[in-house]
Structures are given as structure tokens and as C-alpha cells.
Amino acid sequence: MKDHFVKTENHQRMTAAVRFMEERGSASACLCLLHGEPGVGKTRNISHWGAANGAVLIKGHVGMNLDGLIWTISQQLGIKHRSNRTAEMAEQINVLKAQRAPIVYDEAQAGLAMRWQRTEAAGIEYLRTLGESAHTFVLLVCHNSEVQRFSDSAHIRTRIAHRGEMFNACESDTMSFVNELCEVGIGDGVGQLVHKQTGGKFRLVENAITSLERIAKVKGLSRLELADIGNVTLVVDHEQGLVPKITPKSNGTKGGAR
């Protein structure tokens, strides 16, 4: 599969959110929540945009604490990590101002779990202070299932100036992925088949493209037509095979699967 970035409707949604943040009025409302279901291409889009625009890119993970977050920011800004957090933050703010650099925090729910003394969601609070003081903005990227958690604190909720949502690719975007990323030529109808089997989930589209390339290699073809694929299942969406959640109803009766 080719190493190439394909601009889609999700890219347009993301850049629209960025424009809103750049043109916002209040410097204190420096947070933007960018969310979507797993597999829609959030990381793909923000990584491409962030690298092209000099953003500080942070990837949250299980076990990441506040000190790890601060260290990651300093490392990307070329600042020496130090024990005096106040001095380190001041230097971070100065560099962010000078570089006019935005901050992108992927898997931002990790920042909600951080605690410093009596401060909850310390990671998000730290980024909020940086964004406000440096007159820049912070993109907080998360799954749809995590969005509500950012409303638990009024201090954070009132600093979120904008929310943008990403979705599974439409048919035309799926066709663009297939045509631009596949290492072999693609005939009419193949892109539509990929969309039908994947539902436009970017991760599944990538798997489907790999399957197409494998079929072409086995058959010795430089171009794949719909007839070459036959009834082959290009991808398996394992999410569909998971046991459904059972939720209790409020009246005490058994809940249904969802």
C-alpha cells in the first residue's frame, strides 16, 4: 500500500475546526474537542495536519502521568526537563508563543485520569493553561464514548470553544482511498465493493486494500477488475462478532442487547 495522504471529508471537518479555533475571540476558550468512532481516521488526519503545521503532537496512553505529559511537551519543544515545574511551564509557554505552535493531544481521555494533589483531570488543566497563556489552541482527540467525560468539570467544559466530529468515509472517499493507495490499478466497481464490505471504516479499508494487492499478486495482475475478485470477502469486521452489551431498564425488567 502506498504511503500517501488522501484528503477526505474528515480532513475538511478537521480543518474547519482548526479555522474556528484560529479565529475564535476568547483566548481562554482554547480547547477544541475532536472526536469520532474508533477506526474513522482521527489519528491519521491529526498526525498529517500536525506535522505540516508545526504542532506539538502528544499521544496519550495507559499509565501516562502528568510528569510524562510535561516531559513529552518539553522534548518536542527542545526544552530541558527540570524538577521546577513552574519554570519549565514558563519556558514551554515562551517557546509555544515564539513558534505559534498549536498542541494536539491524541487519546486525550488519558489526561482526564491524571491527578495532581487535589486537582482532577490535571493533564487537561495543564494543557489548558499552556494554550491560554501561549495564545494558541489545543486539539483534544478522543473516541465518541469519552466525550461526556470532558463535561464533568465546568472548568474544562467552559473552555471548550468548539466540537468537531469525524465519521466513517462516504462511498466517494472510500473509492479515493482505494484508487490512490492501492499499488495496482483498480477497475470500475471495486471501490464500491470495498465500501460495501467495510462501511467506510478507515482501518478496514486499509485491510481491504492489502487484500486487493494480495489477490493481484497471486493472479499476476497489474490491474484488478471486479470480475477478478469474485465473491471474495476482503475484510472481516471483528467488532460485529463481539457479544452485545446487556443494559438494565429503569423499571427493573431485563434490558435488551445493544
Which residues make up each language-model segment?
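C-terminal alpha-helical "lid" subdomain
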Residues: 2-13, 39-48, 53, 172, ...
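Sensor-1/coupling segment of RecA-like P-loop NTPase cores
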Residues: 32-38, 126-153
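Walker A/P-loop nucleotide-binding motif
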Residues: 26-46
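Conserved P-loop NTPase "ATPase switch" module shared by AAA+ and STAND
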Residues: 95-120, 142
